Structure formats: C-alpha cells, structure tokens
C-alpha cells in the first residue's frame, strides 16, 4: 500500500521472542485510528496472546492513539515512559491479564534495550507496576559498548 514503509520490526521481534522461548502468533498492520488499533489488539487477545507488542511511531507521534485504544478495551496504563536508555518511550499496560507493550524503535537497533529488561519478566507472568519502572533509573543507561556484553554488564542492574 502507498505510504507504508518496509517493516523492520517483525524479524527482530521474532528473533527476540525465540530467545525467550516464545512465539509471534500474529502480525497486523493496522491504521492509525483508535478503532483500527482496538481491533488489532482485540484480535491478538482473542487468539490467545499472553503479550501484545505494539510498534510503529509511538514515540514520535504526539497524536498516537494507542493509549486511547487500550483504555477503550478496558485496559490499565501502567507507564508511558521509563528512566531507561535505550527505551525511554516504552509503554506498558494490561488488558485483563494480557500485557500490552508499546515498543520504541530502539528495540530494532540496539542489542540491549528496555525490551530485554521487561519483556522476559512479563512472559514469566510477573505483573510489573509503576514502581518497578521507577527503580530502573539506577542502572538504566546502556553505555553502548563497542562489544556488547549484555546481560553481563551494569545495564538494567
């Protein structure tokens, strides 16, 4: 379709999911309207997703309606922003028992990011709260070493 960029997120998320012994069960390219996002998230939840990852310009679009879609689905927004770099514009919410994460583009480009600090915990069933993110400020800055040694480094400690 006109206006769509080639998706670079899917292969990265598939690889990261496999590393967590998880799988991607659905990839949906939705429109930007709240209803489109509601329908896409609902479809994933109805298919049995334990976690829904939302990507695509959330951190650069002040008119992003993803939080509105989550609220419309009865969800609870836990955080939209973290003291972690890379990953400051990460979003976490819950719709029932399903975690819905908004992933910033750094997840595609960095070896270690907020994804690696949070998503494995969510997949293990941990229900994170706002306070959990506040505590990530200590150790939440990746030094972008020439040779990444994550998780054997201070990032996320």
Would you name each region that the model predicts?
Residues 8-14, 42-43, 68-72, 116-121:
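Short, solvent-exposed amphipathic alpha-helical segments in soluble enzyme
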Residues 25-29, 53-56, 81-82, 131-136:
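A generic structural motif
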Residues 36-89:
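Glycine-rich phosphate-binding loop
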Residues 73-157:
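Flexible glycine/proline-rich
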């Amino acid at each position: 379709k006109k206006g769509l960029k080639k998706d670079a997120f899917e292969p990265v998320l598939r690889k990261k999911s496999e590393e967590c012994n998880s799988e991607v069960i659905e990839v949906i390219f939705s429109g930007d309207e709240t209803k489109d996002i509601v329908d896409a998230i609902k479809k994933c939840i109805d298919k049995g997703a334990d976690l829904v990852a939302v990507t695509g310009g959330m951190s650069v679009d002040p008119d992003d309606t993803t939080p509105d879609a989550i609220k419309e689905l009865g969800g609870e927004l836990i955080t939209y922003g973290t003291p972690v770099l890379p990953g400051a514009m990460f979003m976490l919410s819950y719709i029932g028992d399903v975690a819905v994460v908004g992933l910033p583009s750094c997840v595609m480009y960095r070896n270690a990011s907020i994804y690696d600090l949070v998503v494995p915990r969510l997949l293990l069933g941990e229900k994170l709260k706002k306070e959990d993110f506040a505590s990530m400020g200590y150790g939440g800055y990746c030094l972008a070493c020439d040779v990444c040694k994550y998780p054997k480094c201070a990032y996320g400690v």
